[in-house]
Each structure stands twice: as structure tokens, then as C-alpha cells.
């Protein structure tokens, strides 16, 4: 999923540029040759090798070729004087580190890198820690493991709902729910008492509620009490919410408390699955959608509600080091005037947007569900688009937004990668 793998990691030749090598290797020899060369932890072993350059250390370990700037190596020292292991915070003043610093001696054994600095301070790094935290290592990892889906994939997965009592009272139930949510971007809780108060208790099990211009917990009917198409009986096309916030709300909770009529099914589309298809078909268009910033806007003047919100960002948001998609900002209702895009890019942007929209609207990518009293739906608003078919009669939903950081925090505390 949008991870660029390093190719031919072990095919990099030794560089014969002139740098003075300092200090002993593995405690056996002192290298003073003027030509950079690889040094190994043992004569017969190629499991770990390193060489010094003018401003960085090059290390080959666990099939990964890594480069570490000397300032980085000094700044990230985990010694007691540089790092507080109790608070997991840096103690070293980074601004005090000489930007031209070089180690006085370097030694590597089977598990550890040792660096001695000009002032005599010794830094130790576990080789596995370096692999995990190197730029090269991070390029090969995903921040958030996911299963991308269309309707058929999701149905075949038979992802179970979690019982409300298990969700509220056991870590096992909560962990199962969060695992489903992290992998698929949606998750259901069943047997919830159909009241706003009980839905709030459910939501607060995993996160603080994010208060917005809509309040904390809200009732959702077709009375047009707010200046938004959602407060009608009309169909809603697929979209993500609060694109007009600088940081869109991370998670949305829906619970249908009552519906006396027909229609009103909820539409769910995995935006990341659609974006993956764009990446495969037209990578240049994917890149354009990830780089061109757009404004989204919400202007409201209904009753006592007066708001003017503006959020700016590209449709697709990716981590730059591994090209992993982490947020889709897609809402054609709230997209503002396009005035942040140069004339000669506008048509290419519309073409890319059309390609993405085509994927989002493919019938095979649409998962339709009927929300009923007692079944709460949690949606990753940074990933899964939602919509609604038109309906008749009285329909009442309640729900809220959750702070994404708190949901992910809960997941990590339960041992999940999030």
C-alpha cells in the first residue's frame, strides 16, 4: 500500500572516496587508512558491515543498507544523560550539538554500535533499533496496516460486529473492535440501547468526543435545523466529513435511533481502495491529487447558527518517506472555488479528480448497509467515504466525532499497531 521498497540493498559498491577512518573496529584494530572501506563484525560474516564517510556512517545490517548523519547519531543518544527513560523524553539540548561533529572512534559488535565522541561521551545503539528507526527501514514499513476492500472483499471477510457489553466491559471485546476498525476503516457494535446517552457512553469507551460547531453529541433529522444537505431527506453522494476543518474529524459515530419510513440506507466506500486503483492506472494523477492544495468551505446562516469554516489540503495526503496514503479529503458539496491551482494545472487536476471519482462511484465498490436501532457504526473519516439514499418518513440518528489521536492511543495501549 503505497510503500516504495528499496531495491538491490546489497548491491551498493564500496565508495573509494578519501575519508580518514577513525578508531578500532570490533575492538581489534585501529583503521587509519585514507580510503573508505567496509568493516565487518567478524572476518567470515557479512551480517553487519560499516564504513565512515565525511559526514555520516554507512551501515549494512539485516539486509538493509542504512546511512546515519553524525549529528543524528549524537542527537538520538539513549544514554542516561541524554535521554530520560522514565519519561521517554530527550534530555539532550539538540541546539548544543556541533553541526560538524564526528565520532572519535567507532566499534560494532554482533548486536551493538558504539560511538565515542570528541568529548569522550559514548553512545550505544542496538543494531535492530537502528534498522527500525533508520530512514531506509521506515521506507519499507507501513505506519498503519490495512485491508483495502470493495463490497465483495468486505462481505467475504465476514467481519463480525462486537457485542456492546463485551465492547464496554472487556479488553478483548474492545481490542477486537479496534482491530476491525484499523484494518477496514469501519466497525460495528451491536445491542446498543438506542438512546443518545448510551451512544455517548459507547463512544467515550475509546476516545474523547471532539466538540465541533455541531456540539458534542448530536441528533440528526430532516428538519433542516442546520444549513447542510445532510439535514434533509435527499440522497447524499459519497463524501468525507468536515473537509472544511484544517484537520478533518478522524472518526464518526452513527446510531439510528428511529426510522418510520423507507429508504435511507447508508453507503460506504473505501477511499483508499479507490485511490489504489488510481495509483495503479495513472500514478501521475495520484501524485497530482496528493500535491495540489484545495480549499473546502462551510458557510452557515440558519437561525442562530452562523459559521464560516475553511480547510485547506490536497485530496490525497501521503507520508513523504514511504508514499503511504493516510487521509482522503473528498467532498464535492463543500469544495470551495478552485483558486489555489495555476491555470496550466487546472485541467490536469480535473482529469485526475474525474479518475478518482470514477473509481469511487463504481457499483462494485459500494457497500450498502441499513442502520437500525441498536447497531452503532464507527467510520474512519480519513479513509472511508459515506453517503445515503433518499428516504421517507421520520428518521432520527445520533452520533458524534471522535479525536483520532485518542482512538489510536487506545489501540496502541492494547498492543495494536496504529
From Swiss-Prot:
Locate the residues binding Fe cation.
Answer: 239, 241, 386
Q: Which Pfam families match?
A: GBBH-like_N, TauD
Concerning SUPFAM superfamilies, the annotation shows:
Clavaminate synthase-like
Q: Does the keyword Oxidoreductase apply?
A: yes
The keyword Metal-binding is assigned to this record: yes
GO CC terms on record? mitochondrial matrix; mitochondrion
> Which keywords has UniProt assigned to this entry?
Carnitine biosynthesis, Dioxygenase, Iron, Metal-binding, Mitochondrion, Oxidoreductase, Transit peptide
Mind telling me which InterPro entries this protein's record contains? AlphaKG_dependent_hydroxylases, GBBH-like_N, GBBH-like_N_sf, TauD-like_sf, TauD/TfdA-like, Trimethyllysine_dOase
| Pathway connected to this protein | Amine and polyamine biosynthesis; carnitine biosynthesis
Known EC number: 1.14.11.8
Cite the GO molecular-function annotations of the record.
iron ion binding; trimethyllysine dioxygenase activity
- Top-rank taxon of the source lineage equals Eukaryota
Q: From the UniProt record, list the reaction(s) this protein catalyses.
A: N(6),N(6),N(6)-trimethyl-L-lysine + 2-oxoglutarate + O2 = (3S)-3-hydroxy-N(6),N(6),N(6)-trimethyl-L-lysine + succinate + CO2
Q: How is the cofactor bound?
A: Binds 1 Fe(2+) ion per subunit.
Cellular compartments annotated: Mitochondrion matrix
Cofactor(s) listed? Fe(2+); L-ascorbate
Q: Which GO terms describe its biological process?
A: carnitine biosynthetic process
Q: How does it assemble?
A: Homodimer.
What the protein does comes down to: Converts trimethyllysine (TML) into hydroxytrimethyllysine (HTML).
Q: Which family does it belong to?
A: Belongs to the gamma-BBH/TMLD family.
Record-given protein name: Trimethyllysine dioxygenase, mitochondrial
Species whose genome carries this gene: Gallus gallus (Chicken)
Gene responsible for this protein: TMLHE
Amino acid at each position: 500500500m503505497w510503500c516504495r521498497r528499496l531495491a538491490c540493498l546489497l548491491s551498493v559498491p564500496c565508495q573509494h572516496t578519501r575519508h580518514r577512518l577513525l578508531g578500532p573496529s570490533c575492538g581489534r584494530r585501529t583503521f587509519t587508512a585514507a580510503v573508505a572501506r567496509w568493516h565487518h563484525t567478524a572476518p567470515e560474516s557479512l551480517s553487519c558491515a560499516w564504513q565512515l564517510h565525511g559526514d555520516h556512517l554507512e551501515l549494512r545490517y539485516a539486509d538493509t543498507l542504512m546511512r546515519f548523519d553524525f549529528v543524528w547519531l549524537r542527537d538520538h543518544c539513549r544514554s542516561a544523560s541524554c535521554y530520560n527513560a522514565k519519561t521517554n523524553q530527550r534530555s539532550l539540548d539538540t541546539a548544543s550539538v556541533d553541526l560538524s561533529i564526528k565520532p572519535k572512534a567507532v566499534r560494532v559488535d554482533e548486536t551493538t554500535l558504539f560511538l565515542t565522541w570528541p568529548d569522550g561521551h559514548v553512545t550505544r545503539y542496538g543494531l535492530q533499533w537502528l534498522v527500525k528507526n533508520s530512514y531506509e527501514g521506515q521506507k519499507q514499513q507501513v505506519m498503519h496496516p490495512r485491508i483495502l476492500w470493495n463490497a465483495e472483499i468486505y462481505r467475504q471477510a465476514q467481519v463480525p460486529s462486537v457485542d456492546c457489553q463485551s465492547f464496554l466491559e472487556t479488553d478483548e471485546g474492545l481490542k477486537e473492535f479496534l482491530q476491525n476498525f484499523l484494518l477496514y476503516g469501519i466497525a460495528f457494535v451491536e445491542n446498543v440501547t438506542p438512546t443518545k446517552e448510551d451512544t455517548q457512553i459507547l463512544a467515550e469507551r475509546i476516545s474523547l468526543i471532539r466538540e465541533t460547531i455541531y456540539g458534542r453529541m448530536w441528533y440528526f433529522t430532516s428538519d433542516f435545523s442546520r444549513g447542510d444537505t445532510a439535514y434533509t431527506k435527499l440522497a447524499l453522494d459519497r463524501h468525507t466529513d468536515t473537509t472544511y476543518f484544517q484537520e478533518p474529524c478522524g472518526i464518526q459515530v452513527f446510531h439510528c435511533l428511529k426510522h418510520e419510513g423507507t429508504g435511507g440506507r447508508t453507503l460506504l466506500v473505501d477511499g483508499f481502495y479507490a485511490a489504489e486503483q488510481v495509483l495503479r492506472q495513472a500514478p501521475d494523477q495520484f501524485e497530482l491529487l496528493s500535491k495540489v492544495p484545495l480549499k473546502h468551505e462551510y458557510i452557515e446562516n440558519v437561525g442562530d447558527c452562523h459559521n464560516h469554516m475553511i480547510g485547506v489540503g490536497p485530496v490525497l495526503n501521503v507520508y513523504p518517506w514511504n508514499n503511504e496514503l493516510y487521509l482522503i479529503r473528498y467532498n464535492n458539496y463543500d469544495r470551495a472555488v478552485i483558486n489555489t491551482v495555476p491555470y496550466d494545472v487546472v485541467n490536469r487536476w480535473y482529469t485526475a479528480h474525474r479518475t478518482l471519482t470514477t473509481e469511487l462511484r463504481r457499483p462494485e465498490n459500494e457497500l450498502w448497509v441499513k442502520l437500525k436501532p441498536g447497531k452503532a457504526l464507527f467510520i474512519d473519516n480519513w479513509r472511508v467515504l459515506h453517503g445515503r439514499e433518499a428516504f421517507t418518513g421520520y428518521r432520527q440518528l445520533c452520533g458524534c466525532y471522535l479525536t483520532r489521536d485518542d482512538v489510536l492511543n487506545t489501540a496502541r495501549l492494547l498492543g495494536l499497531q496504529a
